[in-house]
């Protein structure tokens, strides 16, 4: 007696592929901060704390140049300097990472596994041509600093 041929076994292979993009964002950074005048150091300054949220532990952060929105004219022969500073909280201490100025940005490699809490600050001061600190002129001051994650 002849039996019909048995069915052939078959196999098939499927490949699953995907990608996870590197992400980086800032959480808790306000749109604006008040600056306070410090008479002892003759500086006007403000700061804000924020967290860096990223799926990459080693990344670069750029602190853009300090953009002047408004400031009074400096006293004759003086210059008004402005600085942006980025600090990272590591083991309960604020460690300065990078500084920018009116004319140049700054960028730095950071390891957020050491701490994801950061502080952005802006300061200004006035000095004469010899570098001696002078009183800053009265008036309204406003600066903008942009920070960017460089992945």
What are these regions (language model features)?
Residues 2-80, 106-151:
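N-terminal small/polar-rich segments of proteins
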Residues 91-113:
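Extended, solvent-exposed segments with strong compositional bias
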Residues 76-92:
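Short, surface-exposed beta-strand/strand-loop-strand elements in extracellular ectodomains
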């Amino acid at each position: 007696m002849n039996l019909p041929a048995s069915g052939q076994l078959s196999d098939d292979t499927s490949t699953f592929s995907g990608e996870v993009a590197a992400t980086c964002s800032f959480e808790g950074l306000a749109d604006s901060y008040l600056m306070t005048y410090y008479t002892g150091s003759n500086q006007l300054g403000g700061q804000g704390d924020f967290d860096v949220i990223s799926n990459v532990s080693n990344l670069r952060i750029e602190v853009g140049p300090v953009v002047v929105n408004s400031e009074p004219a400096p006293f004759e022969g003086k210059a008004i300097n402005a600085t942006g500073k980025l600090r990272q909280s590591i083991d309960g201490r604020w460690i300065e990472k990078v500084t920018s100025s009116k004319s140049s940005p700054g960028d730095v490699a950071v390891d957020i596994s050491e701490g994801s809490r950061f502080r952005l600050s802006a300061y200004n001061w006035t000095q004469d041509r010899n570098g001696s600190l002078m009183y800053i002129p009265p008036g309204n001051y406003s600066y903008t600093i942009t920070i960017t994650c460089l992945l």
